[in-house]
């Protein structure tokens, strides 16, 4: 347990804005496109929707004009398919919104008088993939001008295929990730004293230990700061995702092999992973399965947004390599809830944190290969490109030569950077930048 992670305010997740996502949504509000929040369960999509509702009301939108459906609530259990969804929305706006729990408290309060909606209307649907054929209702909402639509979902494959089928060119996807370290610090500051403040370097370093240990799910900030409590919560979140979004959805018969695969993936964060390598490992453990089964299981885990895969890129040949992707976790806290926190895994964990930070900043990420040497990350966004090496420490000449030397082999003029936990290392070496990891994360 890290003692300074106290619990002075338990409602933290409900009042800290995640401005990155609010700005992305608001850029498309009142535009004829569906706003799609895609992210793993418990990354905060529901809270983002509630914050959006608050902003709409602050702009003068009546609560009667806002329909919020959360499919994790039994209140909406009767909405089984697209027909139910469409009828519910039409009835809601036609006959009045004062029917109880169809929206957050602020909306139902604003809609206290039964009245039909007048003016622009808004439809927000949480965990939309739980409604069969939902895309048909959403397409009809657009065609009929019934309302401005925001939806969220936690299955990448399901959302992508259904959006492409009926809503091609009429939606914008906004990925939602666990808290970045900067967001984590905002939550922690608000929890301590209800507002933003300047953190000392020592405080930032201590909070980074919390972040490294517990990850970035917003829900951890509502719980007592004890390992047994937080790791139990994280393990419960992981089990919900695995059994609801993977085992049940895909009708996996041998849950034991699937569980062992998940443990293998979580245990090899930041390592090159292939189905053949996993199958060979299982064989050595006298576990019988096939490469095809492993491939299917990995695709299911990836679709649940628990993991990401980064392809390898031949820098000299300028082509993606077909095999040997690296696996990264959406949230390292879930890993520690499953297999515990281990100091010896620090390099892979730091790589994972930088990978997720780059993702949150909008970069497309691959793993570089040059002269059979590896570059941890190639991060690309529009015309911008960065080459990045990540390590725990640069305490030896061998480490310095390895991290900087690999980058020196790349002869283009794009930015090259080594990120480490060395706070006082020189700012550059032979034109290659060095950044202290915590400073990089707080930029």
Enumerate the predicted regions with their spans:
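Catalytic cores of nucleic-acid endonucleases
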Residues: 368, 392-438
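Pre-Walker A adenine-sensing motif
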Residues: 12-29
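Hydrophobic anchor at the beta1->P-loop junction of P-loop NTPases
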Residues: 37
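Accessory nucleic acid-recognition modules appended to NTPase machines
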Residues: 225-384
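Short glycine-rich substrate-engagement loop in P-loop NTPases that contacts/grips substrate
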Residues: 68-100, 118-119
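Conserved lysine of the Walker
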Residues: 45
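Interdomain motor-coupling "hinge/lid" segment immediately C-terminal to the ATP-binding subdomain
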Residues: 2, 154-156, 161-272
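Hydrophobic positions on the alpha1 helix immediately C-terminal to the Walker A/P-loop
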Residues: 48, 52
